A protein has these predicted regions:
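Amphipathic alpha-helical dimerization/coiled-coil segments
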Residues: 75-120
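Short helix-to-turn junction characteristic of helix-turn-helix DNA-binding domains
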Residues: 17-21
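Minor-groove-contacting beta-hairpin "wing" of winged helix-turn-helix DNA-binding domains
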Residues: 61-68
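Short, hydrophobic-biased segments on the C-terminal half of alpha helices
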Residues: 44-48
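Short helix-coil-helix linker/hinge
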Residues: 6-9, 22, 86
Length: 123
């Protein structure tokens, strides 16, 4: 399934929506004003655009997501790996771990993911 592109400022909006949903558009205006410094019109414009692209649903002023945070993050990572690492997950991991230390707990968690994938399960 193709997921709609969520731009950076829209993603910050979505983080708020995902945290509070279902949430009224009026509540989102207040939250975006407090957390992002947005004006009322900016919030309503983003709600309209994301609704048109299938990211959220605005049903009589109640906003809910149609794309989950996990789905949006997975799509962004897929795009990043494809665009910057020529589709190579090992190249991405090598670049990430070159400058990013991982704790023993994180390494154990990654190993469990690999083990599940090898057994035919999902992450």
């Amino acid at each position: 399934m193709d997921f709609p592109k969520i731009h950076e400022s829209e993603y910050r909006f979505c983080l708020i929506m995902w945290e509070y949903e279902p949430v009224t558009a009026a509540q989102l205006v207040k939250l975006c004003q407090d957390q992002l410094g947005w004006k009322r019109t900016t919030t309503y414009t983003v709600i309209k655009r994301l609704g048109e692209r299938g990211v959220l649903k605005n049903d009589n002023g109640t906003v809910t997501s149609l794309v989950s945070k996990d789905e949006a993050q997975a799509c962004e990572i897929d795009e990043l790996v494809e665009k910057k690492f020529e589709g190579s997950l090992p190249a991405f991991i090598a670049a990430f771990t070159k400058h990013q230390a991982m704790s023993e707990d994180e390494l154990d968690e990654v190993q469990r993911m690999i083990d599940r994938i090898r057994k035919g399960g999902s992450q």
